[in-house]
Amino acid sequence: MCGIFAYMNYRVPRTRKEIFETLIKGLQRLEYRGYDSAGVAIDGNNNEVKERHIQLVKKRGNVKALDEELYKQDSMDLKVEFETHFGIAHTRWATHGVPSAVNSHPQRSDKGNEFVVIHNGIITNYKDLRKFLESKGYEFESETDTETIAKLIKYVFDNRETEDITFSTLVERVIQQLEGAFALVFKSIHYPGEAVATRRGSPLLIGVRSKYKLSTEQIPVLYRTRNIENVKNICKTRMKRLDSSTCLHAVGNKAVEFFFASDASAIIEHTNRVIFLEDDDIAAVADGKLSIHRVKRLASDDPSRAIQTLQMELQQIMKGNFSAFMQKEIFEQPESVFNTMRGRVNFETNTVLLGGLKDHLKEIRRCRRLIVIGCGTSYHAAVATRQVLEELTELPVMVELASDFLDRNTPVFRDDVCFFISQSGETADTLLALRYCKDRRALTVGVTNTVGSSISRETDCGVHINAGPEIGVASTKAYTSQFISLVMFGLMMSEDRISLQNRRREIIHGLKSLPELIKEVLSLDEKIHDLALELYTQRSLLVMGRGYNYATCLEGALKIKEITYMHSEGILAGELKHGPLALIDKQMPVIMVIMKDPCFAKCQNALQQVTARQGRPIILCSKDDTESSKFAYKTIELPHTVDCLQGILSVIPLQLLSFHLAVLRGYDVDFPRNLAKSVTVE
């Protein structure tokens, strides 16, 4: 729930001001991950070794507040130039300790700032570690679990058995004592110009930039043979020495820059050449050379880490002419759904091929059950497509919230196929559910929007939804692309079913026209803004539908809750008389989603019950629906498409409505309170 960014310039002269600007810009790209406090750690001296110390600047509030605070530091000369320097930065979303400067990161080992660390994740055994360290005389100043890590590395250093112990060895010994999830980056006055980063269960990648030739495209992974099992024996092992053949560097020991980040969006403006770290990797940079090592060797370990090229451009993560990322992403949906289908759906032959699944297709077709697992919006995408998946695959389909799935210890078998849906590919509960299913030998399929994410790497196969970067905390275009990806899976599974060919052609024809129909829906933006003017002072809002559009109600209500802070509830129209009808009166705003599909007559029945109780329904309906409009307070008429795809068109007005409501209520659309984009802790 936090954003990590760090920058090393090796033999690349940079002023302190330029270093600040790089760090702040990196944090701004990551602000969607958390924004209740932020901080940086840089060299505080004026490039004289004898004055070496680390300067911490931390501020409660967003990254802009930190940026302003940096330039108030009279003790720091912004013009001083560093040929080699390592700076770390962090934007926080609180999990341990209230938002405050003292609880924000970087956390320090002592008042002399000998070691500082930035952290994303949760350390579950921090209380035991803190108790041990306090017994050794270490004093704590914050309420965070992260401070325990900073104090622990100081303890290891203070009790080192030799003066020439390496920075990476210290970190290796520390992480063997940590339980939970973490991505960590360390800086120390004892190791100037060096960086160490590591991860377990939380994303971390490293970008590399140099105008000179790099020594390798594959960084070999180094191993230690001995393990540390007890914190009391933490200072009794050493790591083998490195040489240039085991490291990544610029040939000739020339200039190179390294960028460490939780997310590629913070790196892409600097370089598209990145290394994705795996769980328990320890990456160290010293003298401009990057090495990677691990404590244990497993049979399944990849012997190296490849430099990968990101297929992302800076303009994709900028707002452009829109006032908010969420608004931009809503209006990108004609392109994002087209990109999801591009190269996969052949509209001439009515065939669908998902390249990431083709090697496992026979195994998937032999399964006895599909389990689709997600959280929040990703769960709603599963609900939206459950019916069409059951129809096309002729298999039972279970749709599960990841946290509940784990709480119940749900039975999973080897002949199950389990789908894991996550925009970021790092959602903690979904990732834990994936590992639960892998332990039970089920085939696992990832549906993500992030190449190199934990879910995309750990699943047996997968589908990249290709929606492009999504920065706004409230998911919009990822939902519609997840929706289409699951429909495409159903179409691929049913390709040889003769009885389903007419239905398949109907759905594929609907997919072809979808981008243009979405543009038509987006043209209703002004009308939806006018509706928001009537509703923004309300305290509650009901969204009602059934069949294919029940998921639309859940997702629309979630969007309204997320960014407007209005109470909103998605209601299955079939359950109206089992409780929700008691809420209906002339004061309660009700949005009803009624489309020309098999549930149309039943939805009409629910509509009449609402109007009979003096309700004033706002109806999302098909253009040719004259019947629903007779009972409507207001209507928003939408283009018609095949029933199983109608939910893509009907959810967009609710996305727009939530956006306009939030703006009218004076809230920050992209950064709703108490929420973060990537939920990487349970």
Curated annotation (Swiss-Prot):
Active site (record annotation): C2 (for gatase activity)
EC number in record: 2.6.1.16
Pfam families assigned to the protein according to its UniProt record, in alphabetical order: GATase_6, SIS
Keywords noted in UniProt: Aminotransferase, Glutamine amidotransferase, Phosphoprotein, Repeat, Transferase
PROSITE patterns cross-referenced by the UniProt entry: GATASE_TYPE_2, SIS
Binding residues annotated for substrate, in chain numbering: T377, S378, S422, Q423, S424, T427, H578
NCBIfam families: glmS, PRK00331.1
Protein name in the entry: Glutamine--fructose-6-phosphate aminotransferase [isomerizing] 2
UniProt organism field: Bos taurus
The organism's taxonomic lineage, starting at the top: Eukaryota, Metazoa, Chordata, Craniata, Vertebrata
